[in-house]
Curated annotation (Swiss-Prot):
Family: Belongs to the RnfG family.
Name of the molecule in the record: Ion-translocating oxidoreductase complex subunit G
Pfam families: FMN_bind
GO biological process, one term: electron transport chain
Membrane topology annotation: Single-pass membrane protein
Protein's job: Part of a membrane-bound complex that couples electron transfer with translocation of ions across the membrane.
Any one Gene Ontology cellular component term annotated for this protein: plasma membrane
Locations listed in the record: Cell inner membrane
Lineage of origin: Bacteria, Pseudomonadati, Pseudomonadota, Gammaproteobacteria, Alteromonadales
Keywords for the protein's UniProt record, in alphabetical order: Cell inner membrane, Cell membrane, Electron transport, Flavoprotein, FMN, Membrane, Phosphoprotein, Translocase, Transmembrane, Transmembrane helix, Transport
SMART domains assigned to the protein according to its UniProt record, in alphabetical order: FMN_bind
Length: 215
């Protein structure tokens, strides 16, 4: 009887070890897949905002982390991805937050060229009302394309507002708060970039992705 119990115990132990190993392999395999998908999504967004042929570095692996609640809308670190050519600045894609959306925080990325012209804006995450505030999402409306090729200057700063507030950007019927929040966030991001461009491109690379280490 003792031999049978010992044998069964050994079998159960081996089974537990094998199961744990399979779970670990599945976990790490899943994590790698998640990271791969994240990198692919990131690269697709960067390609939309900065033409790949305009720079020669690995932009998705070249970034700095910054924190500016006043300008970037969050007290958590935000990524700034840097595009360079022959070591010279070409563009940057900056993560930003509009903290005052109608239904909460709106996460976005803003592409800015070397002279601080907006190359594009994409909303990454939001909880705005379907059929109203969700028009900030490019999948719903082309409203966000209105930022393309806009440049913030001292002379036109007052234009960086929705039309209801005397600016140039359309608001939505029945939903002014949402576009107002996004316009303000993009404007503040442009201001941050203009004030910190030199520091952004001279800082050490802080991107440490798994794919970069594997490559």
């Amino acid at each position: 009887m003792k031999q049978i119990i010992a044998k069964n115990g050994l079998i159960l132990s081996l089974f537990a070890i094998i199961t744990s190993g399979l779970i670990a392999l599945t976990y790490f395999g899943t994590q790698e897949q998640i990271e791969l998908q994240r990198q692919q999504t990131l690269l697709a967004i960067l390609d939309e905002l900065v033409p790949r042929g305009s720079y020669d570095n690995l932009m998705q692996h070249d970034c700095v982390l910054v924190t500016s609640q006043a300008y970037l809308g969050s007290n958590s670190p935000q990524h700034i991805y840097r595009a360079t050519r022959a070591g010279e600045p070409v563009a940057a894609v900056i993560e930003a937050t509009a903290p005052n959306g109608y239904s909460g925080r709106i996460e976005l990325v803003v592409g800015l060229s070397g002279d601080a012209t907006v190359s594009g804006v994409r909303v990454i995450d939001h909880k705005e009302t379907p059929g109203l505030g969700d028009k900030i999402d490019l999948r719903i409306s082309d409203w966000v394309l209105g930022f393309n090729n806009q440049q913030l200057t001292q002379d036109n700063a007052s234009n960086w507002a929705v039309k209801k507030d005397g600016g140039q950007f359309d608001q939505f019927t029945g939903a002014t708060i949402t576009p107002r929040a996004v316009v303000s966030a993009v404007k503040n991001t442009a201001l941050y970039y203009q004030a910190n461009k030199e520091a952004i491109f001279s800082a050490s690379n802080e991107c440490r992705s798994q794919l970069a280490s594997q490559g």
